[in-house]
Amino acid sequence: MMDQTVSNNFKMIYIASCGEGINAFHLVESTLVQFPDSDITVVKVPHIRTESQVDHLLDRVKDVESLIAHTIVEPNLRQYLVTKAEEHKIVTIDLMGQVLNKIETFLSIRPLGKPGLYRETHQVDLKQVTAIDFALAHDDGLRPESLDEAEIILVGLSRAGKTPLSMYMGVMGWKVANIPYVPGVPMPQTLDEVDRRRVIALNINIEQLLSHRKMRQESLGTSDMHAYSRRQEVEVEVQTAQKYYITKGFSMIDVSNKPIETSAEEIAEMITRRFKAQAHLKD
């Protein structure tokens, strides 16, 4: 459920949500900007739908100095979390319950208490459309003159997964550009002019990269072995790329055998942690 190992030396805030928890995560991160000297880590725990999942969460955090902020809309499960957390002396913040109660009183209508309704009824909003359009317009090194408008810039070798990751993050509402790294081919000058903290280099192991490239060749109807898919050349290409990323000071993440969703969440959390309320650029 959680993808981070927690050290007892840190204070933690866990975002427990029956959905993705993205909005709650941004709310907490934006609030933490007011506490610049705090040493605290925020972790999302999405898709909390059962009491056993609540128990698992509490078992993981009970020995850590932590706080649980939650956006659980199902009232019984929400109360279960609050009650069990109190038993473990864990502080909780209800980010959803008070809002639901006030609106229920105002409208004199009971809420449905069904998770994910907003996502179902607002599948595509303006922010998503804008972000997806941006990803399409800045795919594979296009429009380098407007890299400064990107919230995230992905750099990686051919077939490292830049395009699908850019598109997925566009659906999440992030404006992402991606630039291919080809040894011997100059990178755009504008890449040196942007905030390098927004540049994320994608590392991928050689076996998976070779597999992706061979599949690409087959889809194009070409099976001739050449530098694009020969192991020796690809090994050199990977080493050269990594040296370039290190020289430029780019952050690197390993996307080998990792679902796009996991890589996207990792990058989004990294950028949000670095830029807080300024993670998303204003139009």
Curated annotation (Swiss-Prot):
**InterPro entries in the record:** Kinase-pyrophosphorylase, PPDK_reg
Is Methyltransferase among the key words of this record? Answer: no
Residues given in the record as ADP binding sites: 156-163
Which UniProt keyword terms apply here? Kinase, Nucleotide-binding, Serine/threonine-protein kinase, Transferase
Provide the GO MF annotations for this entry.
Answer: ADP binding; ATP binding; phosphotransferase activity, phosphate group as acceptor; protein serine/threonine kinase activity
- A Pfam family: Kinase-PPPase
- What is its EC class? transferase
**Highest taxon, organism lineage:** Bacteria
Tagged with keyword Kinase? yes
Provide the catalytic activity annotation.
N(tele)-phospho-L-histidyl/L-threonyl-[pyruvate, phosphate dikinase] + ADP = N(tele)-phospho-L-histidyl/O-phospho-L-threonyl-[pyruvate, phosphate dikinase] + AMP + H(+); N(tele)-phospho-L-histidyl/O-phospho-L-threonyl-[pyruvate, phosphate dikinase] + phosphate + H(+) = N(tele)-phospho-L-histidyl/L-threonyl-[pyruvate, phosphate dikinase] + diphosphate
Task: Identify the EC number(s).
Answer: 2.7.11.32, 2.7.4.27
Q: Which HAMAP family match?
A: PDRP
Which NCBIfam families does this entry report, sorted A to Z?
PRK05339.1
Function, as annotated: Bifunctional serine/threonine kinase and phosphorylase involved in the regulation of the pyruvate, phosphate dikinase (PPDK) by catalyzing its phosphorylation/dephosphorylation.
Q: Which protein family is named in the record?
A: Belongs to the pyruvate, phosphate/water dikinase regulatory protein family. PDRP subfamily.
* Protein name per Swiss-Prot or TrEMBL: Putative pyruvate, phosphate dikinase regulatory protein
